[in-house]
Amino acid sequence: MIRTMLQGKLHRVKVTQADLHYEGSCAIDQDFMDAAGILEYEAIDIYNVDNGQRFSTYAIAGERGSRIISVNGAAARCACVGDKLIICSYVQMSDEQARSHSPKVAYFSGENELQRQAKAIPVQVA
């Protein structure tokens, strides 16, 4: 059996640019990509915390240290500057591998400052 698992997550990054006329994609600060293990041109899913939109695109490298999150092309209709996003990448693996897999999760402040990194998401309390 093959399972699709969370590989990397950027939690609550802020959109710094939205460019409808750029050639698709989402530009992400290279430091952020490294923190979540996201590669350039990798497929990503984006969840907009502010408006509920969910969409797919691919990552491109933004200038390292710039804190850029630029939603480009048609995806720019799904997010505005200032919106909070969750950006995820996924990986497929065997059931056996999935049972010991840990994602790379990076948590951000309101101004795209990396606050902490984790290898798991906390259990949600009832």
Curated annotation (Swiss-Prot):
It is found in: Cytoplasm. Keywords: Autocatalytic cleavage, Cytoplasm, Decarboxylase, Lyase, Pantothenate biosynthesis, Pyruvate, Schiff base, Zymogen. InterPro entries: Asp_de-COase-like_dom_sf, Asp_decarbox. Pfam families: Asp_decarbox. Gene3D superfamilies: 2.40.40.20. Substrate binds at residues 57, 73-75. Belongs to the PanD family. Heterooctamer of four alpha and four beta subunits. Catalyzes the pyruvoyl-dependent decarboxylation of aspartate to produce beta-alanine. This is Aspartate 1-decarboxylase. It comes from Pectobacterium atrosepticum (strain SCRI 1043 / ATCC BAA-672) (Erwinia carotovora subsp. atroseptica).
